[in-house]
Amino acid sequence: MAETNNECSIKVLCRFRPLNQAEILRGDKFIPIFQGDDSVIIGGKPYVFDRVFPPNTTQEQVYHACAMQIVKDVLAGYNGTIFAYGQTSSGKTHTMEGKLHDPQLMGIIPRIARDIFNHIYSMDENLEFHIKVSYFEIYLDKIRDLLDVTKTNLSVHEDKNRVPFVRGCTERFVSSPEEILDVIDEGKSNRHVAVTNMNEHSSRSHSIFLINIKQENIETEQKLSGKLYLADLAGSEKVSKTGAEGAVLDEAKNINKSLSALGNVISALAEGTKSYVPYRDSKMTRILQDSLGGNCRTTMFICCSPSSYNDAETKSTLMFGQRAKTIKNTASVNLELTAEQWKKKYEKEKEKTKAQKETIAKLEAELSRWRNGENVPETERLAGEDSALAAEICEETPVNDNSSIVVRIAPEERQKYEEEIRRLYKQLDDKDDEINQQSQLIEKLKQQMLDQEELLVSTRGDNEKVQRELSHLQSENDAAKEEVKEVLQALEELAVNYDQKSQEVEEKSQQNQLLVDELSQKVATMLSLESEPQRLQEVSGHQRKRIAEVLNGLMKDLSEFSVIVGNGEIKLPVEISGAIEEEFTVARLYISKIKSEVKSVVKRCRQLENLQVECHRKMEVTGRELSSCQLLISQHEAKIRSLTEYMQTVELKKRHLEESYDSLSDELAKLQAQETVHEVALKDKEPDTQDAEEVKKALELQMENHREAHHRQLARLRDEINEKQKTIDELKDLDQKLQLELEKLQADYERLKNEENEKSAKLQELTFLYERHEQSKQDLKGLEETVARELQTLHNLRKLFVQDVTTRVKKSAEMEPEDSGGIHSQKQKISFLENNLEQLTEVHKQLVRDNADLRCELPKLEKRLRATAERVKALEGALKEAKEGAMKDKRRYQQEVDRIKEAVRYKSSGKRGHSAQIAKPVRPGHYPASSPTNPYGTRSPECISYTNNLFQNYQNLHLQAAPSSTSDVYFASNGATSVAPLASYQKANTDNGNATDINDNRSDLPCGYEAEDPAKLFPLHQETAAS
């Protein structure tokens, strides 16, 4: 809700930069002539502004003259805008930003960041601030977020008050000037810049830095909000001077187009006669709509070049500033009424309406009496205040001129009465006017009430709609999660099915390949059987080829077996031409390599056994640590017993004191009885009255002293009893935690023991598998010898067959009548060879099957060995983690005990700092900033280091006070590990101007870096330790 409207003009300031090096070398003239602080003459024409800055003006002078007041206005609840306009290379970015981290050359934006927090530190401590910033640019007429480069085309929308804003822009909560500068650095690194003939760092976009400040008074619940737009506009360009081309030329076109739209808006506002202002022609003017003729206090910098080379552009810029100076803004405080304030306002208006209705009823009654001819006495007429109120709200009522009373009177009296009647009619007319005005006011209030009710109903409807949408989105989110789970399950099932089907396809393809091989062999055998005797030589050649194929198959199997074991693949010969013995020699060599691989597997099994022994040893170490934890628990139990005995002693003292109190009460009663007796006696003895009064006063004073001492002693004992009871409760809780941790460690120990047993069983199983592997190796050796014998037999048969064929060919010419007998013997030999070939094929198949079985067994064995090794590593890691967890728990428990003791002693020392609070919401993945809702937050790693060091030093000091601990020293002799964080912490406090951090609204422990004396550091602790 906006209140306190006031009209103000746009504040226009002109700043000239010095001549640059290129202009000096070119010989350009310095054309501006300055007259006073508010005017400049260019070409004989004066231009007047709110302030004109010559080239020698410093950044600090510019800031104090124009921007300092706008910071106060924003903190008071107004909206503010500062933007720079001008030609390219005229000093706009230098004016707005400058060098961010240079105290002398920093521009308006960093100085405003520091000034905001300086003002906040000096404001009322009941105020709470929320400050968030946004940084975006308008590049090629698209809004681009400089803090999130993935957001490249944001849109402009309007809120419920029809104020434009950029939807989806990143907002960062900040709590110090340094955080604002970090945000500016981050955004500035993402901004578009280019090199032109006039500027080495020419801005190619309009950048807008938005600071949104919300403040709330915690006591009155009054809320104010203010926005500050800090815009650095890109400069207008003349392509013939900048030399822009390509992408830079397109950027220049868009820049000039948006600046032209800005000029059209300012021209329309300056004329004041146009009903339409083209805010929507450009996204820049759309965003700055409230700054130009709206609810905002706006300051415009027009930056100019003093060179005669840029004479035309400078004059155009100055004319632009003069038009902007005539624009009027209506600034108002952005005040948000709370529900309680709305309710009070409603009740106030309701009471006012009720009073007005009562006044109207009285006026109507009085009017009806006047119209009926009655004379209303002065006492019954409305008072002056009521008449004035009625005059504001009454409606106009027609006057009845007919009198219902006819009286016979004299002419003088008649004239007198007519004058009286005319006067009364005049009063009636006045009353009618008052009634008319009051009725109009009532209607206006009724309309306001209806508007408020409609607003309340619409707000409730919007709230319900948002709730429904939220529930709908929640349900959709849950449904989407369920769908994702179902899809993941379906994908897992598909993956499992795919793996199974792939394995089945591989098995079927292998079987198909075996069948094809067997079919080809059978076809070859059939062809050899159907061939004629005269082709026996060709049959011999086929037999050699088949022998070579068998050898190649055997070599392939050996190669695959070697790959599985890990020796690499055997390089097969391209063609086997007769040296079969050499091939067998190669096979034997690779079989010996496989044997060496098997030996390496045995060596790995032995290493696993050694690892098992190491795991046993580590488990024993864990058992010893467990026993140490049990000893610590017993020590804590002994502490609890000693405290219990101390409590019993305190109870006994309390009982004695109560008994003494009772005896003193009895004595008091006796003394009172004696006093009564003395009073009776005093009546008889008047001369002794003065002495008795003095005795009585002395006795009363003595009793009062006894009573006060007794009460003090009782209060002190009660406090000690409460403190000891709290300590006992905390120690009991700690003991329960230690018991739980002990049970957890025992469970982990049992689990590790079970895992060790399982590992032993798996190792035995691996040993059994290794023995089976050795047996398979022996069987393979036997098969190898069998194959060698069969191949040797086949080789011999081939030689005999060749010799026999040669002999028969030689004798064929001499023994033609015996051809039939020779053919018969040849067929017998062919059948014999076929039988031998079948036997050899069976042997080969058996060898292949055995080789395949071994090939299947070996990966399983290797997989189990790898699983065992991984399990051993996992057990070692778990054991190490359990050991580290036990040590961490031990340290944490000790720290918890010391922290509880500290909390008891420093319970009443917390006080709020006398400065305004800057609240920053807490975010996941960051350390929360300090705020009224989280006063123990930290802002940097140095603060965490400082707190940890302070706590550890406090614990060390406590252990020094105890006679059983002498190992810790104070601040480790102020070592380098603790001085650096403390120095950075002290520097942060010095920069902020506070004794404590601006985000910390509590009283911390004394700073150990400021007072190295332990007696000054922890006086409370030392007093308690001494007592």
Curated annotation (Swiss-Prot):
Principal location listed in the UniProt entry: cytoplasm
Keyword Chloroplast found: no
CDD domains assigned: Khc_CBD_cc, KISc_KHC_KIF5
Record-listed Phosphothreonine modification sites: 397
Residue runs in coiled coils: 331-905
Binding site for ATP: 86-93
Region (Microtubule-binding): 174-315
Name of the protein in its database record: Kinesin heavy chain isoform 5A
Species of origin: Rattus norvegicus
